[in-house]
C-alpha cells in the first residue's frame, strides 16, 4: 500500500474511533439517569470518559434500547445449553463494558464463558489503561494477574482484550486461537455493534464468510437499515450525519433492508438466519417490566421520533450450522418485521401490503405569499372554520408558542394574528370544530410533566374560557357530533389518564362518556373520525395506557340509553392484518373532502413498520371498508408527516408545520405550510 493510501486509511480509522467516543458518552448518560439494567453504585462507563453530559430523553431511550437488544441476543446464546465452553468475541468493542457487565452479572453463570474484546490497537491500548486505572473494573478481570506485561493488552482466564484490524482475518484468527479459542469445540458468538457497517462491502463480507467456517459460530450484528428507502427523512438525515463525520455506512448502502441483510448472511455460508428490526424487539421481545421501569426514569413524549429510530436499526442473528442453532424469536407474529431462513428455505417473511390506488391523488401547489410570516411549528392545533383556518400553539425553533393565527381562504388569502392572554404556550392540544364559526381547544401540554385541562372557545372571532376537563389531557382525539339538533364533543382523553368524555354544547359541561371497551377508551395518539352521513365512526391507531401499540380498528356508534345518557358501542372491524399494520400509527390526522364516509388518514408514525411514501395517505371507505392509497406528489425535499396540523378545505389539503428530531443525527423540520390540491388520479 502506498504512503498516501496508508494515510487515508489511518484517517478513516480515526473517524470510526470517534463514533466509539460518542457512543460511550451516550451510554454513560443512560447509566447516569438510572435506566433499568444499569447497576447503581459502580459506573461501568465513567472510567472511559472525561465528561458525562446528559443526553435528551429520546437519545437516552434509544441507547438504552440498543443496549437491551444486544444483551437480549447475548442472553439467548448463553441460555442455549450445549455442554460446550462458550466464547463471546466483540468485534470493534471500542470502550464498551459489555464483557464486564456480563462477568459481574448474577443473572447468568459465566464461569464457562470467555470474553474477547477486539478493536484497533490504539483503541485497545487506551482501553487497557483505563481499565487498569479503575479499581472496580480491574477487580472483575484482573484478579489472577495474568495480564500482558507490556501493558497494552489484557489476558486472563476469562477475559482478553487485544488489538487487531478486522480486515486482517488471518491475524485475527491466529490471535483468538493463541488466546484460547478452540474453533472445533467451542460455541462462539461474534458481536458487531455498529462496527462492521463501517467496513467496505467486500471487507465485511469476507469477515462474515470467515466467521461462518467455524462449526458452532453465531452472530449478533446491530446495524442501521433504511426500510423506506434513503429518501425517508429519518434515513436521509442519518446517512448525511455519518457521511459528514467521515464514517459512511458502507454496509447500509449495500444492504439497506432486512430482506437484503438475510441474503448477505445466506450467500456467505450461514445455514440459519434471523433478521429483525429493533421495533420488533421493542414491541414483542423487550421485557414488559423493563419497559415499565423505563417509563419511570424521566419524562418522555417523543414517541414518533423514537419509533423512527427503532425502525432504522436491525438485529442480525445467524448460526453457521443448524446443529447448535437457537432462536431469538420463538413465535413469530404477523406484525413483526422479521425474516427467518433455515438452510435453503425462508420459514417466515412478513411481506407488506400492496395498496390499490384511490380515485384521488394530491398534487403539490404553491404556498400563498401571506403564509411566509407563519412560523414552522410541531404539534400545532389546526381547525377548519367556514372560510378560514385557525392555527394555534405548537413548538417552534424559539420554544413552545401560545400564538394563534386566522388564515382566510378567500381570494388570495390573508393571515391575522389573533393571540389572546387566555391562551397558554403549549403543544399537543386537541381541537374540534363545533360549527362553521366555532371551535374548541382542549388540553395540551407545556412540558411532559405539565399537562393542561383547560378548554378555550373561539366563536365569531372572540375567545372565551370554558369549564375545564375533569382531569388533564394531551395526545387526545376529539370529534364533533350532532344529535337531535344539539352539538356534542366526544373526547378520547389520551394521556395521562385516558377515558372518554363528552361535552354538551347546550349544557356547557363535561361528563364521563360510558364505554365498556378498553380498546376504545384507553387509547392515546389515535385517529378518531365520525361520519354524520352514516351516523357511526371509526377509530384506528394509537397506543394503550401501557404505551403498547393497538392494532385493532374499531367501528363505533353513540347510543342514547334510557337514563338520557350516551354510551359508546364498538365492534372490531375484520381487516387483513397487513391493513391493521398500515393503520397502526400514532399522531396521524384525518380529513375528508365532501363525503365524510370516506375519511383520508394522513401521516403519523407507524408503530409496527415504517410507512412507505405511497402509504402516507390512505382512504377508508366506511361503506364497504375498503382501503386504498391516496397518491401524494413527491417533491425533491419530502415533508415528514409527523407532529403536524392538517386542514381540508374545498379540494385542498393543507399541512401546517410538522417534523421530527432524528435521534442524535440532526433534525428534519417541514416548511411552515405545505399545500396540496385533490385531483382525480
UniProtKB/Swiss-Prot annotation:
<comment type="function">
    <text>Probable S-adenosyl-L-methionine-dependent methyltransferase that acts as a component of the wybutosine biosynthesis pathway. Wybutosine is a hyper modified guanosine with a tricyclic base found at the 3'-position adjacent to the anticodon of eukaryotic phenylalanine tRNA. May methylate the carboxyl group of leucine residues to form alpha-leucine ester residues.</text>
</comment>
<dbReference type="InterPro" id="IPR029063">
    <property type="entry name" value="SAM-dependent_MTases_sf"/>
</dbReference>
<dbReference type="InterPro" id="IPR015915">
    <property type="entry name" value="Kelch-typ_b-propeller"/>
</dbReference>
<keyword id="KW-0808">Transferase</keyword>
<dbReference type="InterPro" id="IPR011043">
    <property type="entry name" value="Gal_Oxase/kelch_b-propeller"/>
</dbReference>
<dbReference type="InterPro" id="IPR007213">
    <property type="entry name" value="Ppm1/Ppm2/Tcmp"/>
</dbReference>
<feature type="region of interest" description="Disordered">
    <location>
        <begin position="1"/>
        <end position="21"/>
    </location>
</feature>
<keyword id="KW-0949">S-adenosyl-L-methionine</keyword>
<feature type="binding site">
    <location>
        <position position="193"/>
    </location>
    <ligand>
        <name>S-adenosyl-L-methionine</name>
    </ligand>
</feature>
<comment type="similarity">
    <text>Belongs to the methyltransferase superfamily. LCMT family.</text>
</comment>
<feature type="binding site">
    <location>
        <position position="119"/>
    </location>
    <ligand>
        <name>S-adenosyl-L-methionine</name>
    </ligand>
</feature>
<dbReference type="GO" id="GO:0005829">
    <property type="term" value="C:cytosol"/>
</dbReference>
<feature type="compositionally biased region" description="Basic residues">
    <location>
        <begin position="1"/>
        <end position="11"/>
    </location>
</feature>
<dbReference type="Pfam" id="PF04072">
    <property type="entry name" value="LCM"/>
</dbReference>
<feature type="binding site">
    <location>
        <position position="92"/>
    </location>
    <ligand>
        <name>S-adenosyl-L-methionine</name>
    </ligand>
</feature>
<feature type="binding site">
    <location>
        <position position="66"/>
    </location>
    <ligand>
        <name>S-adenosyl-L-methionine</name>
    </ligand>
</feature>
<comment type="pathway">
    <text>tRNA modification; wybutosine-tRNA(Phe) biosynthesis.</text>
</comment>
<dbReference type="GO" id="GO:0008175">
    <property type="term" value="F:tRNA methyltransferase activity"/>
</dbReference>
<protein>
    <recommendedName>
        <fullName>tRNA wybutosine-synthesizing protein 4</fullName>
        <ecNumber>2.1.1.290</ecNumber>
        <ecNumber>2.3.1.231</ecNumber>
    </recommendedName>
</protein>
<dbReference type="GO" id="GO:0031591">
    <property type="term" value="P:wybutosine biosynthetic process"/>
</dbReference>
<dbReference type="GO" id="GO:0030488">
    <property type="term" value="P:tRNA methylation"/>
</dbReference>
<keyword id="KW-0489">Methyltransferase</keyword>
<dbReference type="GO" id="GO:0005634">
    <property type="term" value="C:nucleus"/>
</dbReference>
<keyword id="KW-0819">tRNA processing</keyword>
<feature type="binding site">
    <location>
        <begin position="165"/>
        <end position="166"/>
    </location>
    <ligand>
        <name>S-adenosyl-L-methionine</name>
    </ligand>
</feature>
Amino acid at each position: 500500500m502506498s504512503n498516501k493510501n496508508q494515510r487515508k486509511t489511518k484517517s478513516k480509522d480515526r473517524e470510526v474511533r470517534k463514533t466509539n467516543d460518542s457512543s460511550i458518552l451516550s451510554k454513560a448518560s443512560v447509566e447516569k439517569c438510572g435506566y433499568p439494567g444499569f447497576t447503581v453504585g459502580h459506573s461501568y462507563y465513567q472510567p472511559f470518559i472525561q465528561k458525562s453530559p446528559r443526553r435528551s430523553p429520546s437519545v437516552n431511550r434509544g441507547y438504552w434500547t440498543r443496549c437491551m437488544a444486544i444483551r437480549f441476543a447475548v442472553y439467548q446464546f448463553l441460555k442455549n445449553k450445549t455442554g460446550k465452553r462458550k466464547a463471546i468475541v466483540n468485534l470493534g468493542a471500542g470502550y464498551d463494558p459489555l464483557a464486564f457487565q456480563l462477568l459481574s452479572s448474577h443473572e447468568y453463570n459465566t464461569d464457562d464463558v470467555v470474553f474477547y474484546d477486539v478493536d484497533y490497537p490504539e483503541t485497545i491500548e487506551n482501553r487497557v489503561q483505563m481499565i487498569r486505572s479503575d479499581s472496580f473494573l480491574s477487580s472483575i478481570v484482573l484478579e489472577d494477574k495474568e495480564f500482558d506485561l507490556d501493558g497494552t493488552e489484557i489476558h486472563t482466564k476469562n477475559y482478553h482484550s487485544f488489538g487487531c484490524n478486522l480486515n486482517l482475518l488471518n491475524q485475527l484468527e491466529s490471535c483468538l486461537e493463541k488466546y484460547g479459542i478452540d474453533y472445533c469445540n467451542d460455541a462462539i458468538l461474534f458481536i458487531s455493534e455498529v462496527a462492521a457497517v463501517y467496513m467496505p462491502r467486500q471487507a465485511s463480507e469476507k469477515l462474515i464468510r470467515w466467521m461462518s467456517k467455524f462449526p458452532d459460530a453465531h452472530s449478533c450484528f446491530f446495524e442501521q437499515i433504511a426500510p423506506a428507502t434513503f429518501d425517508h427523512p429519518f434515513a436521509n438525515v442519518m446517512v448525511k450525519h455519518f457521511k459528514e463525520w467521515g464514517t459512511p455506512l458502507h454496509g447500509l448502502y449495500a444492504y439497506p433492508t432486512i430482506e437484503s441483510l438475510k441474503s448477505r448472511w445466506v450467500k456467505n455460508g450461514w445455514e440459519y438466519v434471523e433478521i429483525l428490526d429493533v421495533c420488533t424487539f421493542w414491541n414483542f421481545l423487550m421485557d414488559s417490566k423493563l419497559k415499565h421501569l423505563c417509563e419511570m426514569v424521566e419524562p418522555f413524549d417523543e414517541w414518533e421520533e423514537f419509533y423512527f429510530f427503532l425502525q432504522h436499526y436491525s438485529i442480525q442473528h445467524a448460526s453457521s450450522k443448524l446443529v447448535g442453532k437457537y432462536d431469538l424469536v420463538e413465535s413469530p407474529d404477523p406484525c413483526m418485521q422479521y425474516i427467518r431462513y433455515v438452510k435453503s428455505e425462508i420459514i417466515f417473511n412478513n411481506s407488506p401490503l400492496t395498496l390499490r390506488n384511490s380515485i384521488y391523488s394530491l398534487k403539490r401547489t404553491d404556498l400563498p405569499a401571506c403564509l411566509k410570516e407563519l412560523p414552522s411549528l410541531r404539534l400545532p392545533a389546526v381547525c377548519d372554520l367556514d372560510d378560514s383556518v385557525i392555527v394555534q400553539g405548537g413548538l417552534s425553533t424559539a420554544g413552545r408558542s401560545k400564538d394563534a393565527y386566522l388564515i382566510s381562504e378567500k381570494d388570495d388569502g390573508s393571515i391575522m394574528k389573533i393571540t389572546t392572554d387566555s391562551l397558554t404556550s403549549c403543544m399537543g392540544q386537541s381541537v374540534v370544530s363545533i360549527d362553521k364559526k366555532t371551535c374548541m381547544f382542549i388540553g395540551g401540554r407545556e412540558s411532559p410533566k405539565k399537562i393542561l385541562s383547560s378548554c378555550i372557545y373561539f366563536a365569531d372571532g372572540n375567545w372565551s374560557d370554558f369549564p375545564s376537563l375533569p382531569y388533564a389531557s394531551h395526545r387526545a382525539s376529539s370529534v364533533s357530533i350532532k344529535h337531535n339538533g344539539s352539538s356534542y364533543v366526544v373526547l378520547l382523553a389520551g394521556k395521562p389518564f385516558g377515558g372518554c368524555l363528552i361535552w354538551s354544547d347546550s349544557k356547557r359541561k363535561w361528563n364521563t362518556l360510558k364505554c365498556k371497551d378498553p380498546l376504545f377508551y384507553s387509547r392515546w395518539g389515535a385517529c378518531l373520525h365520525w361520519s354524520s352521513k352514516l351516523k357511526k365512526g371509526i377509530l384506528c391507531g394509537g397506543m394503550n395506557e401501557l404505551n403498547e401499540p393497538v392494532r385493532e380498528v374499531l367501528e363505533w356508534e353513540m347510543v342514547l340509553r334510557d337514563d338520557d345518557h350516551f354510551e359508546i358501542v364498538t365492534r372490531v372491524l375484520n381487516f387483513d392484518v397487513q391493513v391493521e399494520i398500515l393503520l397502526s400509527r400514532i399522531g396521524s390526522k384525518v380529513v375528508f373532502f365532501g363525503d365524510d364516509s370516506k375519511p383520508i388518514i394522513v401521516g403519523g408514525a407507524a408503530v409496527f413498520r415504517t410507512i412507505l411514501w405511497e402509504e402516507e395517505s390512505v382512504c377508508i371507505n366506511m361503506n364497504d371498508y375498503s382501503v386504498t392509497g391516496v397518491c401524494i406528489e413527491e417533491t425533491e425535499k419530502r415533508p415528514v408527516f409527523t407532529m403536524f396540523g392538517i386542514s381540508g378545505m374545498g379540494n385542498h389539503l393543507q399541512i401546517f408545520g410538522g417534523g421530527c428530531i432524528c435521534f442524535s443525527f440532526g433534525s428534519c423540520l417541514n416548511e411552515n405550510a405545505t399545500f396540496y390540491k385533490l385531483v382525480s388520479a
